[in-house]
Amino acid sequence: MNQSYRKRLESYVKKTYHVEAEQLPFNNEDYAVLRHAESGKWFAVFIVKARREFGLAGDGNTEVVSLKIRDRMLSDMLMKQPGYLRGYPSSKWNWTTIVLDGTVPFEDICKWLDESYDATKSKTKNKKVPLQKRRT
């Protein structure tokens, strides 16, 4: 693999959702957010921190991505698998952090990225229009 997971994920999001990573509000290249173009809501946060800050063994830094998972039971199940951590920096149950070191396959991370994108869509976009209100 020539590119880092982060670069590959950024390319995937740009191609799939036409969204580019932003350093705002951090002004630090170690951090970036992915957000919906329409609403500005975040659906992913890339973070580089010392391994110990994530409760991981070893020295040095590691890169992670935090994503929103709608299903609490699923989120709890993921926490029991290697490469998944409780949400960082938000410890709310619906944010899950994935270590970008190859432990979690790239395809799985893309699946969770898609889930996070859907979970953070604007509520008005997600609402189903009742049949009688639809135009015919």
Question: What positions do the PLM features span?
Answer:
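Charge-dense, helix-prone N-terminal extensions
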Residues: 1-136
